[in-house]
């Protein structure tokens, strides 16, 4: 249903920008977060705010929300200055912060009441508004449930409802799609488009460029500077004619991508199923005229990577010197070894894994195997049972039934010994926020049982590799997101495990950071490391050799990314994406 947006008496002229910033500077001590940017937010549209970690996106949103004062320059929202004129502007602005801004120990209804109190809504107004918002978000059956017990998609809806309590004319969304599955993101877009149709202006900050492509306009920030202001299509057009798809030999997509990145003429190369997407440098197109290179339409991510300097090249220092986890020839991919290694034991094996919580079955007879050098993806909607399966495989949760082994060790009989052979990078990165970077490295080295000499060597190597030296004394919770990710990967790999479990490892990071991360992971597979990953980001799932799709605790599909896409190909959808396959397969089961 559409959500009515009440008109206001002081509506601005139709062409007046919903917000504008002029020569805007915001500094925190010696750190310049925004360096003199000027831009206008068109009314009645969705504007995407993109840029790498530390670009200044959240700072800009907080300035627009009236939560900060600029160091210099000006901010206008709905024709007025935030934090001035009796808070009128803030009353007409809705703000949904990262992680949705919810109080997880309060119920859905209590969260709504808390935000209604902050908006000073009287009893009549909140009764009407609650009824509208609960219908709009489909949360009416869950008003008594604690926010912390909601799925990611339901938390997202509740965060949006809280931001909409004041019937805002400007809605500020700070990475609303992080940590939620494609079905939930699609539902969020439906709701936001309805709001825009009713006259609301939306600023949508995102690390996912396919989300930004849906926006009417984008602002691209980097290091506090505005690099681009305009329609996303115009930015994508800058690389038209320079984007190609190269079909890789069977099982060699990772090696093909790495080969492309060694070429001086290549700006970017990423895996897409059994193919590699290649972006050529200007004036180098003639080098890609062979039959193996098929021209394809550009996308925003291609232009974004070019504008920020291209993908990082060179060998992964993390993989150098890594002890081989299995008898795997250096550089060979999982599929190349599959025939020769068919008789070898899987490094990860799950058979009939089941976990019940009372009458609720969170995981229902889940089974799969992962061999040395293979990347296996566990995909599914929020609440499908992925994290439960993950925790059982890591020895953190005892199965109700079934068996699991890691690196040849049975988790039911020797969970602690199995945990010593795996690395686990959990959601939110498993770091101890009140410990410093150095203390986190020291702690994880100790719990993994490294000798004093090995600990000294490995910790020093990680500090150099991930450029952590300037942050060693900083508390982990205060690190920028990209450095939290680096530290988490360092802690998970200090002991050179045979198996890596990655639970949404790049959630919320930009494409360049994602490429850096997967550059290391792909290199580790050449050393025989087996990888199991969960992700809600379908472009990332393309890096997997095989995918298991989980829904309501059961594995409903398994195959390569291309095999899953082929299952939903039709005349109406001749070139389905992995997100198309995800949604179609889930909806097919739900029908």
Region spans (language model):
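Catalytic Walker B motif of ABC-type/P-loop ATPase nucleotide-binding domains
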Residues: 171-175, 500-503
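Conserved ABC transporter NBD signature motif
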Residues: 73-84, 88-89, 402-410, 417-418
